Amino acid sequence: MSAEILRVHPDEPQPDRIDYIVSCLRKGDVVALPTDTFYGLAVDPVNLQAVERIYQIKSRQKHKPLSLLISSLAMAYELARDSDPLIDRLADRFWPGPLTIIVRAGTKLPLRSTANTGNVALRVPDAAIPRAVVERFGLPITATSANLQGASECTHAACVRDQIGDRIPLIIDGGPTGHSMPTTIVDLSLGPGRWEILREGAIPTHEIVMVLQR
C-alpha cells in the first residue's frame, strides 16, 4: 500500500493536521516529514517497536543511533544526563538550525533508543512543522533521514514517496526543505569541556570552533 500524502503549510502548520500527525505517532506509525535540511523519519523514540521499524525501513545498521528533534534547550536538558555550558553556547548561537549535538543520555530514553551507546544526538530544527509536532506531542521525535541506506537524502516529498512510499503509512508534504546539506554534528559526550566535530555540514567548522573556544 502506498503512503498517504498530507499537505501541511511549511510556515503556519494547520493545527488539525499537526494533531493528526501526533495521533499517528502515538499509534506507533512512522511518519516522514520535512526538516530544515532533509526529510526525516519520525517516530516516538520511547516506542521501541516503532524505532525498530525505522531500522527495517531504511535497512540501517543497528549500531547507528537515531538523532532526535526537540523543541527547546529545556527539552535537551530533560534528555541529557549532565548539564554542560558548551551545550548552552552552541544552542544560543545555532538553535534553531542545522546543528546536531551529541550528549550523554539521561534515564528518560531506553538504552535501545540510543543504539546501546548511551549517547543521544539532539537538535532544534529551524522548521515550523517538526517543531509544532514536537510541541504538540510533548516528546522528542526521531529525525533520521527519510531515504534508503546508501541512497541520496530527500529534500522534497516526492523523493520520499519514490524511495520508501511503499514502506511507510504517511508522508507530510511541506514543500522543499531549506538546505541541501546535512547538519553539522558536534560530540559533547566525551567529558567536561571536551568536544569533537564529527561532521561538517550546513554550519562551517570555523563557526563552531569560534563559539566553543571563546
Stretch-by-stretch model annotation:
Residues 1-214:
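Active-site-adjacent structural elements in enzyme catalytic cores
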